[in-house]
């Protein structure tokens, strides 16, 4: 009866997924979204060079471009209530801890929505449930090259199972192939490969057990427009002697260039 419970100042926070997709897509349209429900992005096509014959009029091409619309119709929130007794008796700053978790909840929601866009790419390689092979990666790169996709800002978003499979490949981990200075088998970290920025996350669409929708894409394949960045509201509810915290975000996402992205069917 003389041995009280002692609470540690340290806490066990729930683990969080590595959120990597939102930072890998085009967010350049956000300045145009201060008002309104949509952002319309015009397209500009290529023109043809023609041979000029003497004493003949030149031919003018007729421009009939289409627009891609980014609809800003996603309004997400996360909320939590903290009773006064918890806040008073807790040795840690509970309110501060959960404010951080509110931000993570909204960030994960955005990344999750973007992950669903991978399945919208019309081109795919690989087989669900089987790790993406080196040949699959090269095939995806060829599809991008064939479409004249710029060489910079290319990303390979993969599941942890895909990372492990790549660490086992000499071409991805052996210094004879990747040069000195990178030691994936020692650090467990994959460096850039084939001009791709590599990122690993558990936050991918998994059609079934052991399966994952990975992707190789250029930044301009997908667009994210956050019209209202996460905004937190805090008020005291006297009826329940509780602090109420809520955070909201308004955004939209859209596939912009289908041939700039490749769905890699693989393992999870």
Please report, for each region that a protein language model flagged, where it lies by residue.
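Extended oligomerization regions of viral-like shell subunits
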Residues: 35, 39-43, 138, 143-228
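Short acidic, glycine/tyrosine-flanked loop/strand segments centered on an H-E-D-like triad
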Residues: 66-88
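Short, structured patches in soluble enzyme cores that scaffold and shape functional sites
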Residues: 84, 158-160, 249
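Alpha-helical scaffold segments that mediate packing/assembly in large oligomeric complexes
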Residues: 85-151, 262-268
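Extended, compositionally biased alpha-helical segments that mediate assembly or anchoring
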Residues: 234-268
């Amino acid at each position: 009866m003389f041995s009280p419970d002692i609470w540690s100042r340290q806490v066990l926070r729930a683990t969080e997924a590595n959120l990597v997709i939102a930072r890998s897509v085009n967010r350049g349209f956000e300045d145009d979204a201060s008002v309104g429900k949509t952002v319309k992005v015009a397209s500009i096509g290529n023109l043809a060079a023609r041979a000029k014959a003497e004493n003949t009029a030149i031919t003018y091409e007729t421009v009939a471009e289409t627009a891609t619309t980014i609809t800003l119709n996603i309004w997400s929130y996360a909320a939590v209530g903290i009773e006064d007794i918890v806040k008073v008796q807790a040795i840690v700053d509970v309110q501060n801890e959960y404010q951080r978790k509110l931000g993570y909840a909204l960030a994960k929601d955005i990344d999750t929505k973007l992950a669903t866009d991978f399945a919208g790419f019309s081109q795919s390689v690989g087989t669900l449930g089987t790790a993406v092979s080196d040949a699959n990666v090269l095939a995806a790169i060829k599809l991008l090259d064939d479409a004249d996709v710029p060489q910079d800002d290319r990303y390979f978003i993969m599941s942890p199972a895909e990372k492990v499979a790549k660490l086992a490949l000499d071409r991805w981990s052996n210094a004879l192939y990747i040069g000195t200075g990178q030691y994936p088998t020692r650090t467990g970290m994959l460096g850039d490969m084939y001009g791709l920025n590599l990122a690993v996350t558990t936050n991918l669409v998994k059609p079934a057990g052991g399966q994952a929708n990975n992707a190789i894409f250029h930044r301009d394949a997908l667009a994210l427009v956050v019209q209202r960045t996460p905004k937190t509201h805090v008020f005291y509810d006297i009826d329940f002697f509780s602090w109420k915290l809520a955070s909201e975000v308004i955004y939209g996402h859209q596939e912009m260039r289908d041939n700039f992205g490749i769905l890699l069917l693989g393992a999870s």
